[in-house]
Amino acid sequence: MLYAGKSPDGSHLLKSARYLLKELPVRIAHRIKSIRNLPFIMGCNPTLLQVHELYIRAFQKLSEFPPIKNSEVEGQYCRLLQQLLDDHKDVVTLLAEGFRESRRHVKDEAVIRQFLDKTLTSRLGMRMLATHHLALHEDRPDFVGIICTRLSPKKIIEKWVDFARRLCEHKYGNAPRVRISGHVAARFPYIPMPLDYILPELLKNAMRATMESHLDTPYNVPDIVVTIANNDVDFIIRISDRGGGIPHKHLDKVMDYHFTTVESSTQELPNNTILGNMVDMVNSGQSNPMHGFGFGLPTSHAYSEYLGGSLVVQSLQGIGTDIYLRLRHIDGKEESFRI
């Protein structure tokens, strides 16, 4: 993606569109098959059936699209892609609701994890490809499609710190300060989109843990420290909080979908109105409330592994938690990942 570049005659757009025309129906067909292979009781869930119908309609529209022979047809294809992106924007929420409604009927946690890991990462890949093609029509400084050629980890962290602090202040009346250290001047080519999901999830978790472990002193809470480390192979973002750590009995469950320390009666849905409006303020549409749905951390973990990296949780019970997000560079110097 990074080295495809742009051609003056627009042939790069036709080439990209033709690739998507062949590739996207195949990927969507795999997702339809995986839904149909779910245990019968889950496949009958109305919310999951809604996702199934969305994928079937997308497959039909994409597979019936005519060959892309000129820029006019490519423009029509772009409009279809944008329509499908809009139609599918709530798929993660629907999956979360559908599995929460039906998971009690399935004893094997591995079935749920394997399905959601594959479905969510496949969805990320398809959205990245489609959004990249649409972005190739734009002329933004330091961008080739969705790839930022000079991404600053510090700046993207600061953006999501501001977002997470506003959420936290709304819920708790205050929010921890965040200090950023390490290789703060680092810049390199990378795709902001997955970071725009992962970082707010990790920051919200750290802020919630900090505030809830200091309920007696909500206006005197320890800082969260974010450290950036950059090298030739990858870059690491460590988020360290003093929120008391994760209890031993929960540590092996934090990567399970729907695991949450919040009681079910108080669980908040991702489309919560007030918090949803805050999400809209930063044009996200991807991030959910401070807690209670149990999807953020396992999804972030799946995304990081899909991108050739890792997400590791280190808990010091009684002190706090360190989370290490490690992602491979995409500059072509070392082995990276395939979208």
Locate predicted features.
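Signal-transmission coiled-coils
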Residues: M1-R177, F188, P192-D196
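ATP-lid-like helix-loop hinge signature
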Residues: N174, R187, I191, K204-R242, ...
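Glycine-rich nucleotide-binding loop
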Residues: D234, G245, G294, Q317-Y324, ...
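Glycine-rich acidic phosphate-binding loop
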Residues: S240-G245, F259, H329
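Short adenine-binding "F-helix/F-box" segment of the Bergerat
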Residues: H248-M255, T266-Q267
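A short beta-strand-to-loop micro-motif at the C-terminal edge of the catalytic HATPase_c
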Residues: D280-G292, Q314-G320, R328
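Short alpha-helical Gxxx[C/S/T] motif in the catalytic ATP-binding
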Residues: G296, S300
